[in-house]
C-alpha cells in the first residue's frame, strides 16, 4: 500500500492511497478458501470444487468483498501509520474507472482531533448550593403529584367549558371534505389547555356545553406522523356529550391509601426521598455549569468543523421542531434565523468542552466499566419492544459508534465527578428559588459533546420565548438522568411507532410530562422562563 499526503491544513487532512492489485487478489484467494468447504457443484464432492471454478461462479461478489476489506484495512493502516485521531468517520472515495485486477486508488479525507495539552485541574473552586427538603417542599411535591392525578366530576348541563375543564366528545374529521383513516372517534375525553392535541383544537372547545355541535378547523403540524396529513387544513365535526370540572383532591390518609400506601406519613417519606434527589440534581447541575464555565474560560483552541456542524445541526433541528409548535410557527422560525450564528457559537463551545473533558478523563484514567456499560445497554433496551431488545443489545455490542453514543453521557458525568473530587468546594444553604435562579442565570446545558459522543443525545436547547427576544443566549436546564438513557439513534429494530391515527389526540407534544416518580433529578417545572439558547 502506498500513501501520499495531499492536504495538511489546520485540522484537515487528505491522503491518496494506492492498494495494489496483488493485495486485492490475495484477499480474493482468502475469500475463495473461506467459502470452499461450503460450495456445492454437480460432479464434485462437497468442499472439493476447484478454486478456479469458485472464482468463475462467484468472482464478482468475491472481488467486491475483497476490495471492501482491502479498503477497510488500508484506512486502518493509514490511521496507525500517520498516528491520526479522526474527529469523525473519514470520507473514503474510490477513484472512478476502477476495474478488477487493477490497483485501487483511494482518496481519504478527514478532520483530526486537535492536540490538546492536558488541562490543569489545580485551583478549581466551586460553590455548592444546597436546599433542605423541608416539610413545605415535600407537601408541594405531593400537591403537584395530586394535581397530575386529578379527576373530573360532572358539571351542570348549562356549564360552558373553560380552560382546565374536561369535555367528552364524538368527532369526525375530514380534509377537503373527505374523511381520513383514524379521523373519527367517540367518547374522547379532552382536557382543555392540556396541550395534548393538535394546536388550536382545544382552544376552540372553550365555551361549549353539553349537547353543542361545532365544527373545528385546525392545521396538522408539518411534522405530523401521517405523511398525507402533514400541513393539511382539516375540519372536525364535534358533538359535545358532557362537560366535567376538576374535582378537589383532599390530601390525607385516604389519598395515600388510594396510592397503595399505608398512610399520609408514608407518602411524605416517599416524596421526601424524591424531593431530595430532585434538589441534589439541581445542586449538581449548578456546580457542573460553573465547572464548565471555568474550563471554557481557560481554554481556547481550534475544533473540528465537522464536529461543530454535527452539533449545530442537532441544536438547530431541535429548535426548528420547537418553533413549529409555536402559535405562529413562521414568525418563530424567522426570529430563530436571526440568531443562527449565536447557536453556532454554542455548538463550538459544546464541542470544545467535550474534547477537554475527554482529554481530562483519559489523562486521569477515568473509565466506564464493562458492568456499567452493560447496565446502560440493558436500560436503553427497555425502551424497545420486548421482541426487539436482544437485537438492540447485539447491535450496540457490535457497533462502536452506537456504543460510544450510549457511553458518552456516563463517561462525561464520571469525569465531572472526578473534577468535583479535586475541586475546593464551599457549601452554602439556599432556597430552591435562588438555586433555580442561579441555574437560569447561567442557563448552561449539562451535556457536552466529545469525540466519542456521536452527537445524538436527547438534549434539548431551551425553547425561545415567543413574545420577546432574550438579552443573552445560553443553554437549557437539562434533565441529566435523561441523557444517560438516550439510546443510539442508529439502532435497528426500533420500538414500533404507535400507529399514527389521524384523530386529534394523535398530535400529542413530543415531550409529555413525566410522572412524579420519574422527576428525580429534573429541575423544577416552575423555573423562570428559559432563555432562547443552550450555551454549553
UniProtKB/Swiss-Prot annotation:
| Compositionally biased tracts (Basic and acidic residues) | 472-502, 516-525
Q: Where is the composition biased (Basic residues)?
A: 527-536
Q: Name one Pfam family in it.
A: FKBP_C
Q: List, for all copies, the residue spans of the domain called PPIase FKBP-type.
A: 164-249
PROSITE patterns, A to Z: FKBP_PPIASE (PS50059)
UniProt keywords, alphabetically: Cell cycle, Cell division, Chaperone, Cytoplasm, Isomerase, Rotamase
Query: Could you list the residue ranges that cross the membrane?
Result: none
Taken from the UniProt entry, a GO cellular component term is:
cytoplasm
Give the start-end ranges of region Disordered: 439-536
What information about domains appears in the record's comments? Consists of 3 domains; the N-terminus binds the ribosome, the middle domain has PPIase activity, while the C-terminus has intrinsic chaperone activity on its own.
Q: What does the sequence similarity comment in the record state about its family?
A: Belongs to the FKBP-type PPIase family. Tig subfamily.
Q: What PANTHER family is this protein classified in?
A: TRIGGER FACTOR CHAPERONE AND PEPTIDYL-PROLYL CIS/TRANS ISOMERASE, TRIGGER FACTOR-LIKE PROTEIN TIG, CHLOROPLASTIC
**Full protein name:** Trigger factor
This chain's source organism reads Sphingopyxis alaskensis (strain DSM 13593 / LMG 18877 / RB2256)
Q: Which gene encodes it?
A: tig
Amino acid at each position: 500500500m502506498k500513501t501520499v499526503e495531499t492536504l495538511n491544513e489546520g485540522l484537515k487532512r487528505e491522503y491518496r492511497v494506492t492498494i495494489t492489485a496483488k493485495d486485492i487478489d490475495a484477499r480474493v484467494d482468502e475469500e475463495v478458501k473461506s467459502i470452499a468447504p461450503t460450495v456445492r457443484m454437480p460432479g464434485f464432492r462437497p468442499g472439493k470444487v476447484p478454486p478456479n471454478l469458485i472464482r468463475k461462479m462467484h468472482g464478482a461478489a468475491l472481488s467486491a468483498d475483497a476490495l471492501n476489506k482491502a479498503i477497510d484495512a488500508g484506512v486502518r493502516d493509514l490511521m496507525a501509520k500517520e498516528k491520526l485521531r479522526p474527529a469523525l468517520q473519514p470520507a473514503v472515495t474510490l477513484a472512478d474507472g476502477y476495474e478488477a485486477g487493477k490497483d485501487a486508488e483511494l482518496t481519504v479525507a478527514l478532520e483530526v482531533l486537535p492536540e490538546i495539552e492536558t488541562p490543569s485541574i489545580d485551583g478549581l473552586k466551586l460553590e455548592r448550593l444546597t436546599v433542605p427538603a423541608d416539610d413545605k417542599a415535600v407537601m408541594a411535591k405531593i400537591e403537584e403529584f395530586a394535581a397530575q392525578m386529578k379527576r373530573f366530576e360532572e358539571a351542570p348541563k348549562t356549564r360552558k367549558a373553560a380552560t382546565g375543564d374536561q369535555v367528552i366528545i364524538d368527532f369526525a374529521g375530514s380534509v377537503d371534505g373527505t374523511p381520513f383513516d383514524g379521523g373519527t372517534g367517540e367518547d374522547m375525553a379532552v382536557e382543555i389547555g392540556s396541550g395534548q392535541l393538535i394546536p388550536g383544537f382545544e382552544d376552540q372547545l372553550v365555551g361549549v356545553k353539553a349537547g353543542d355541535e361545532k365544527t373545528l378547523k385546525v392545521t396538522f403540524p408539518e411534522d405530523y406522523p401521517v405523511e398525507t396529513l402533514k400541513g393539511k387544513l382539516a375540519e372536525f365535526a364535534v358533538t359535545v356529550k358532557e362537560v366535567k370540572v376538576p374535582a378537589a383532591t383532599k390530601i390525607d390518609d385516604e389519598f395515600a391509601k388510594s396510592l397503595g400506601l399505608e398512610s399520609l406519613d408514608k407518602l411524605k417519606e416517599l416524596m421526601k426521598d424524591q424531593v431530595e434527589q430532585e434538589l441534589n440534581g439541581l445542586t449538581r447541575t449548578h456546580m457542573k455549569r460553573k465547572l464548565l464555565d471555568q474550563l471554557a474560560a481557560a481554554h481556547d483552541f481550534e475544533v473540528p468543523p465537522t464536529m461543530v456542524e454535527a452539533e449545530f445541526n442537532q441544536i438547530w433541528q431541535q429548535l426548528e421542531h420547537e418553533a413549529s409548535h409555536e402559535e405562529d410557527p413562521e414568525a418563530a422560525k424567522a426570529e430563530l434565523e436571526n440568531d443562527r450564528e449565536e447557536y453556532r457559537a454554542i455548538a463550538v463551545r459544546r464541542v470544545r468542552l467535550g474534547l477537554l473533558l475527554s482529554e481530562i478523563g483519559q489523562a486521569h484514567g477515568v473509565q466506564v466499566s464493562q458492568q456499567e456499560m452493560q447496565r446502560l445497554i440493558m436500560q436503553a433496551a427497555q425502551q424497545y419492544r420486548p421482541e426487539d431488545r436482544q437485537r438492540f443489545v447485539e447491535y450496540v455490542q457490535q457497533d462502536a459508534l452506537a456504543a460510544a453514543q450510549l457511553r458518552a453521557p456516563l463517561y462525561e458525568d464520571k469525569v465531572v465527578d472526578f473534577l468535583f473530587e479535586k475541586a475546593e468546594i464551599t457549601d452554602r444553604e439556599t432556597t430552591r428559588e435562588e438555586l433555580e435562579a442561579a441555574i437560569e442565570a447561567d442557563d448552561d446545558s449539562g451535556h457536552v459533546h466529545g469525540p466519542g459522543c456521536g452527537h445524538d443525545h436527547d438534549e434539548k436547547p431551551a425553547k425561545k420565548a415567543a413574545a420577546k427576544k432574550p438579552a443573552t443566549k445560553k443553554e437549557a436546564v437539562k434533565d441529566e438522568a435523561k441523557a444517560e438513557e438516550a439510546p443510539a439513534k442508529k439502532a435497528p429494530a426500533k420500538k414500533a411507532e404507535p400507529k399514527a391515527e389521524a384523530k386529534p389526540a394523535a398530535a400529542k407534544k413530543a415531550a409529555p410530562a413525566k410522572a412524579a416518580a420519574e422527576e428525580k433529578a429534573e429541575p423544577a417545572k416552575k423555573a423562570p422562563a428559559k432563555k432562547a439558547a443552550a450555551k454549553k
